[in-house]
Each structure stands twice: as structure tokens, then as C-alpha cells.
């Protein structure tokens, strides 16, 4: 479940024809809520997990979302993907990642498989678009994704953080471990972003050249 405020999205982007990227969209559960408050936006949702492919094809038509069974990363081509498995009697799969889980990760994973991967930069060039807002949940791979942002500068970026100790090579941690990795902050700040909100698990970055209202996070 995403904790991005629907009121924040509605106040800043309602009735605007923005381009919204939902990267790591899972089964489009949160995407449908974003669509409900931004009816004039164009949505692009990305999820490489095979288990969600069929349901996402159906839901994307129902919700009016452009769905792509891709991973977004710093690689154009194929990349190894580590799928989670259902935990006990849980109805929904846990988070998956392009990074191999470490011993600190309590989630059970199946056999990794290859998935298609694209960068934000190459996808935008191919489709002649540029995102105005990005919601991203990619289990420690956020830094890799934004390394290939290219010339694109979304007005806002909402990142669902994950402790990088849970995945090999993962970055962007807010879970109070001994050593905190702030490389994602540094990268986005170098692109002109400011940290508007940060919690143990989430961060909101706003580009300094835009004026978005963030009263929900004050």
C-alpha cells in the first residue's frame, strides 16, 4: 500500500493532463486510486512479475492505464529478476526485486528469471513522452532507476523506500540501521530536487523549479 496522499495529488494535478509513471506497480492496486483522483492524467504502469501479468492486462483496460510487463532499471535489455512467493496464507505476493535478497530479508523467493528491462530515458524517447510525476516502489533499486533519468525532470517523485540491507547492491534506506545510505538523496539533489517529506519508509522529492503544495506533509 502506498502512503502518497491522494489529496496531495488531487490538489496539485487535478484536471491537468499530466503523465504519471507508476514504477513497480504490483497488481495495480494503488494505481487505481491514483487514476480515481487524476482522471485527466495519462498513466504508464510497469511491473515485471509474471504472476501479475494476466490480472494487470485486465485491470489496465478497466482503469485506462498503459501497462508494461517490464522492469525499469539502468539496463536496456534483459535483467535477472527475483520473484517473491506467497507467505503462508497471505493472498497477495510480497515484494520482488532485480537484486538478490540477503539473509536479512524475511520474504521467501522463488527461482529468478530473466525479464525485459528499460531505462526511463529510453522508454520516454521511444514513446515521445516525459513524466510529470513518478511513484516508484522497486525494492532497493531506486538509485539504479534514477541514474538513467536522462534529461527528464518530473515535478515530483514519490519513493517507497526499502532497507538496502535486504538486497545485494540495494540503496536508499530509512529503516534505522547502523549505517544509512543517502546516495539516492544526493543523486536527486544533483538533479535539482529538494526533499519535501521523509519518513522511515517514504520520501517525496519536489523539483526546485516548480511550486507544488505540500501542506499534507507539513
Which positions does each model-derived feature cover?
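Phosphate/nucleotide-binding beta-alpha loop and adjacent structural elements of enzyme active sites
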Residues: 1-218
